[in-house]
Amino acid sequence: MTDPLVRDALRAFVAEREWAQFHTPENLAKSISIEAAELLECFQWNADADTDAVTEELADVLTYCLLLADRLGVDPDQIVLDKLELTRAKYPADKARGRSTKYDAL
């Protein structure tokens, strides 16, 4: 999922600007939230949001997520797989299929 070329390009971008000093986990988490709100704003008045605008905001969210993972020294692919395993246990396919019910009500 995470291409090393993307990771290396992000690292180079940050290094060229000497921005690593600002990339604390707290600041990166805040930036994820801010960019996620901007992504949501694309859908605020129209469920059929402009794909270009959504793509730009989604890229911002993903960029900050990857930067945070890098800052924390965690592998984004592995943490997604680990979380997916936990979610599988909470939402067994035979009980959750086609339902939006929360896991504790299945």
Please state what every model-predicted region is.
Residues M1-L106:
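Flexible "arm" and connector segments at domain edges
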